Regions:
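Bacterial Sec-dependent N-terminal signal peptides
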Residues: 1-24, 295, 299
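Short coil/turn segments at secondary-structure boundaries
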Residues: 3, 131-135, 150
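Short glycine/proline- and aromatic-enriched beta-strand/turn motifs that initiate or cap beta-hairpins
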Residues: 20-94, 98-102, 106, 112-113, ...
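Short, contiguous, well-ordered secondary-structure segments
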Residues: 35, 40, 140-146, 150, ...
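Outer-membrane beta-barrel channels and translocator barrels
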Residues: 44, 94-96, 151-156, 219-221
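Residues on the lipid-exposed face of transmembrane beta-strands in outer-membrane beta-barrel proteins
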Residues: 51-53, 87-91, 105, 143-151, ...
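Extracellular/periplasm-exposed beta-strand and loop segments of Gram-negative cell-envelope proteins
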Residues: 58-80, 104-141, 167-207, 235-290
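Short connector loops at helix/strand junctions that flank enzyme active sites
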Residues: 82-84, 94-96, 138-144, 155-159, ...
Length: 299
């Protein structure tokens, strides 16, 4: 009798549990899926990685003449101002909310070597060569982070939000010379009293920006999408005065004998920018990074 009463008492809970499972199944069925049953839109906990979609679009524009570049391009002067070499990542806190980050590390080194015969060599053939070497280095690091809110139906999603951007760049020039400043080279007529020349030049730039954005994203395959984004940036950028080191062969103390010395000089000017810009083709990542076309993959 007790077992019968217990069974009857549990019937409502069984029906409630079944109804809840059925409701969850219906919600699950309402999610947008591909023909193979794969979810198309991102979910809470997903990670997205994106990059510049311009090369893909340029390839499509040139399909009519695949062996040549017809000159058609998806990029305009203001395209992804300062962000064309930046990785974009997102983490979905919720189905319709994501934190996003940007990271760009760009480095360029250029070296120019000029060769010439050693003027002090007595050789008539196979004359030894000396070289002047000029190096130019440019390093840039860009960090960005923000919050993205999303809404929409089916494959087309809209998004909007804001992000904070930090950038730092360092520029350096160095010079190395085949003919040194010394007494021997002065005696040979290769160096003259009062001569001077640069050894290196250094300058850094710091930038800070606050940017709002709005855009649309279309999922052409499960967890794969193209996005178009437009933004407005409020930014500040400041260059250091820069420092230059020069070497001298002279007689600053009036002793009657030239000697070698180096001296460092501060730059005469310092440049800073503050402003609000929108898709204006600015070369600074802090002033906009406005229009953007991206290809994104969600995992």
């Amino acid at each position: 009798m007790k077992k019968t009463l217990l069974f009857i008492a549990l019937i409502p809970f069984a029906f409630a549990s079944y109804a809840q499972q059925d409701e969850e199944a219906e919600i699950q069925d309402d999610l947008l899926r591909s023909k193979k049953g794969h979810l198309i839109l991102p979910e809470s906990g997903d990670i997205a990685l994106g990059f510049d979609a311009t090369p893909v679009l340029n390839f499509g524009l040139n399909l009519v003449n695949i062996m040549n570049n017809t000159g058609h391009t998806a990029q305009h002067p203001g395209y992804v101002s300062g962000f064309n070499q930046v990785i974009v990542a997102k983490y979905f806190l919720e189905d319709n909310m994501a934190v996003r980050g940007k990271l760009g590390i760009n480095s360029l080194t250029e070296k120019t070597t000029t060769y010439f015969d050693d003027p002090l060599s007595d050789a008539t053939t196979n004359i030894p060569e000396l070289e002047d070497v000029y190096k130019e280095k440019n390093n840039e690091v860009i960090f960005g982070g923000g919050l993205e809110l999303r809404r929409g139906h089916n494959r087309l999603q809209g998004f909007y939000g804001g992000e904070l951007l930090l950038a730092r760049s360092a520029y350096k020039e160095t010079y190395e010379y085949g003919i040194s400043y010394n007494q021997t080279n002065e005696d040979e007529g290769l160096v003259f009293g009062g001569a001077n020349r640069p050894l290196d030049y250094k300058q850094t730039t710091f930038g800070l920006g606050l940017r709002g954005f709005i855009g649309v994203e279309y999922f052409f395959a499960p967890k794969m999408s193209f996005s178009a984004e437009f933004g407005w940036g409020l930014g500040f950028s400041k260059d250091s005065r820069g420092t230059e080191t020069r070497e001298f062969w002279d007689d600053p103390d009036g002793t009657g004998t030239n000697s070698y010395r180096t001296e460092e000089f501060q730059g005469a000017t310092q440049v800073s920018f503050t402003g609000f810009s929108v898709d204006n083709g600015s070369t600074s990542a802090i002033f906009g990074g406005s229009a953007a076309l991206s290809l994104l993959f969600h995992f």
